[in-house]
């Protein structure tokens, strides 16, 4: 842990209570000069740290800074039963999913944390921003700094993954739960991986699996989650303004990205230990597609394959059940659907991390 992280942790544990420079130097085992440099660096990052007359430092409010220490501290408070989860945070990265895939390929599952009372091992990769955020079907996920949350949860379940589709479905429900807890806002789901608030997309999920070539089973998965938190209209291109939104639409909400990262991660771990039927039931209750007329895109990029249908249901395997205009009922496990009035197939901000 860096000196800056140690100082931030110490001040965060004493919100609105001054901590002397000497006390910080002793607890961090560094010089007063190193403390002064760390304080200045934190101020440059936006932390409201005041100097007091007796030479102490006062943190006025919890800063919206994402790092390994702030996440570990928050996660330990929110989910003490999952404490010790392996986490890595980056200021910027090409893609959290790409990085997670790289370390999973190089190191295997040895670095994952075996979570007590769960059915597998986990780790989480978090970034302040992404330069090459990825979505489904090779699309881009726009990931600007300090306005969103971009994370990838690595999951290696006992016995492998029998139904990969349920991972995306479960994660979508988990994100909705986290947003409700932190912001008290109800969100809805567009099959299969998009979260909507006020008719605008605020989150996408990209799930990727690792197959054991000897057994043919999927041993591990990476669940990439990208959430727009406090963007305003100036943060979106004219194209994205038609489809993309954010949770807060400004930067004044007191909730921090660390709090959301903690809740999303914990809710995902929790829900992956639930029965599949209960997950599907909640997923269906949050879907806004059932009963709607849609266009089905079974092969992305091939407009000749598009057909119109009515959404009837979401079945127990997380497939979208539709009825085409000729009366045929189909269970969709891949592809995309769009409402006639929407622009949900925009090439950007489409999903994932």
List the model feature ranges, each with a label.
Residues 2-181, 201-203, 255, 329, ...:
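N-terminal lobe of the biotin/lipoate ligase/transferase fold
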Residues 50-52, 190, 208:
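Solvent-exposed beta-strand sheet faces enriched in polar/charged residues
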Residues 91, 189-191:
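Short loop/edge segments at beta-strand edges and connector loops
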Residues 1-31, 40, 44, 158-165, ...:
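Long, positively charged amphipathic alpha-helical accessory segments at protein N-termini or as interdomain linkers
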